[in-house]
From Swiss-Prot:
Homohexamer. It comes from Glaesserella parasuis serovar 5 (strain SH0165) (Haemophilus parasuis). It catalyses: a 4-hydroxy-3-(all-trans-polyprenyl)benzoate + H(+) = a 2-(all-trans-polyprenyl)phenol + CO2. SUPFAM superfamilies: FMN-binding split barrel (SSF50475), UbiD C-terminal domain-like (SSF143968). Prenylated FMN binds at residues 175-177, 189-191, 194-195. Catalyzes the decarboxylation of 3-octaprenyl-4-hydroxy benzoate to 2-octaprenylphenol, an intermediate step in ubiquinone biosynthesis. It is a peripheral membrane protein. GO terms for biological process: ubiquinone biosynthetic process. Pfam families: UbiD, UbiD_C, UbiD_N. The keyword Cell membrane applies. This is 3-octaprenyl-4-hydroxybenzoate carboxy-lyase. GO terms for molecular function: 3-octaprenyl-4-hydroxybenzoate carboxy-lyase activity; metal ion binding.
Length: 489
């Protein structure tokens, strides 16, 4: 099913028992996080806090708190169907010309989906039913969650930050946390390689005296939200990809104070600018690592306008030690990554980002090994092919007889097929997440690849072990008599 706006998605979730309305008064200061965290850890429903303490606007949490809800938000029946979405992205990333008429006919469904890519610009939109401007702007009227007791201030978490570089036609949508520091001020924490930061840097070089326009949408439709966290090709806008997910064009409307187009169905939109010379010290905040991060200076976003629906919903989340919502998103989007990687490396059988690895810091890859040194090639490919994995610290490569998603299997492969000196590849001075305080220098650290494959000639001088296997006839015989033996499973 496809959803035109967030409300349609919430209606369906409620029908399926996947949304719980909380009518009791709950404080956005710490209490919502505690309730959301307990609920998510048990695979529970999305939560709509209808009576946040001190505020009139309800708060939505845990929207994508299970992989199944992520798949639903992308218009898919289950997480397995996300593989097909990954195949479409692989096609868009590197489209292949048809080899003949039959192949052309086979590609028609993919090209038909591309027709849904351009956005549809509206003159009037629900997200602008209420307009607050200038001195009336007061971010303290929004129920912005204060997630952890060590956090320095309330934090905007699920805002879709919309930017555009001076030389680009496409808009960029990114999700960057934003610290509340004043009634019209937020700190925009974006890392230097992210799309918004790149747009900002290009703007500074081209317009040394003009503020950088920014709009932030909260509570967009699920396809648009998820497009912002999906590994789409750099040449494709998130709005275009959302149109593919939804099956019809993304409806947008021009911001009131700038030329940026925002999701027409968004619940709340913050409009404003970043002064090129204004920064502030951000943090500390509890993050997806399970720790509080270091403080660092980032640009300040000045909000000049707030537009919203008359009965707006504030969409929020928390981040902490997995499981949290980012970890769940990573688990679901894992299925999207696989076909993209397989198009470049057909030997890859499976690719898994364990949620315990903080979404992306450790990857397990299984391959159909074809030659000596093959595992090392795959390691390098994982680190370099998609920008999403430039911060992956550990890549473990196993043969295809190992289940990448079973730690018992992976550990068995490491301990029986790996020699630390021969099979561990260390690379120093590589890009690392700024939040990774384990690295010796902020933003710069090392990576480790572990070759846990069976070794071929040229990789070892010893006779390699033969795995123990069971006799299939005996297995079948015991299966037939098992119940009669009276042994409990």
């Amino acid at each position: 099913m496809k959803y035109k706006n967030l409300r349609e998605f919430l209606d369906l979730l409620e029908q399926k028992g996947e949304l719980k309305r909380i009518t009791q008064e709950i404080d956005p200061y710490l209490e919502m996080t505690e309730i959301a965290d307990r609920t998510l850890s048990k695979g529970g429903p999305a939560l709509l806090f209808e009576n946040p303490k001190g505020y009139k606007i309800p708060v939505l949490c845990n929207l994508f708190g299970t992989p199944e809800r992520v798949a639903m938000g992308m218009g898919q029946e289950d997480t397995k169907a996300l593989r097909e979405l990954g195949k479409l992205l692989a096609f868009l990333k590197e489209p292949e010309p048809p080899k003949g008429f039959k192949d052309l006919i086979g590609q028609l469904p993919q090209w038909k989906q591309v027709l849904n890519m351009p956005s549809k610009v509206l003159n009037k939109a629900d997200c602008q039913q209420v307009v607050i401007s200038d001195d009336d702007v007061d971010l303290y009227q929004l129920p912005i969650m204060h997630c952890w007791q060590g956090d320095v201030a309330p934090l905007v978490t699920w805002g879709l930050t919309i930017t555009q570089g001076p030389y680009k036609k496409r808009l960029n949508l990114g999700i960057y946390r934003q610290q509340l520091i004043g009634k019209n001020k937020l700190i925009m924490r974006w890392l230097s390689h992210r799309g918004g930061a790149l747009d900002f840097q290009e703007w500074k070089e081209a317009n040394s005296d003009k503020p950088f326009p920014v709009s932030v949408a909260l509570g967009a439709d699920p396809a648009t939200i998820l497009a912002a966290v999906t590994p789409i090709p750099d040449t494709l806008s998130e709005y275009a990809f959302a149109g593919l997910l939804r099956g019809h064009k993304t409806e947008v409307v021009k911001s009131i104070s700038n030329d940026l187009e925002v999701p027409a169905s968004a619940e709340i939109v913050l409009e404003g600018y970043i002064d090129l010379n204004e920064t502030a010290l951000e943090g500390p905040y509890g993050d997806h690592t399970g720790y509080y991060n270091e403080q660092e200076y980032f640009p300040v976003f000045t909000v000049t306008h707030i537009t919203m629906r008359k009965d707006a919903i504030y969409h929020s989340t928390y981040t902490g030690r997995p499981p949290d919502e980012p970890a769940v998103l990573g688990e679901a989007l894992n299925e999207v990554f696989i076909p993209i990687l397989q198009k470049q490396f057909p030997e890859i059988v499976d690719f898994y980002l364990p949620p315990e690895g903080c979404s992306y810091r450790l990857a397990v890859v299984t391959i159909k090994k074809q030659y000596a040194g093959h595992a090392k090639r795959v390691m390098m490919g994982v680190w370099s092919f998609l920008r999403q994995f430039m911060y992956t610290k550990f890549v473990i490569v196993c043969d295809d007889d190992v289940n990448a998603r079973d730690w018992k299997d992976v550990i068995w492969a490491i301990t029986t097929r790996c020699d630390p000196a021969r099979d561990a590849t260390l690379i120093e001075n590589t890009p690392i997440d700024y939040l990774d305080f384990a690295s010796p220098i902020a933003g710069l650290g090392s990576k480790m690849g572990i070759d846990a494959t069976n070794k071929w000639a040229g990789e070892t001088q010893r006779e390699w072990g033969t795995p123990i296997t069971k006799n299939p006839d005996v297995v079948k015989r015991v299966d037939e008599i098992w119940e009669s033996l009276g042994i409990e499973d």
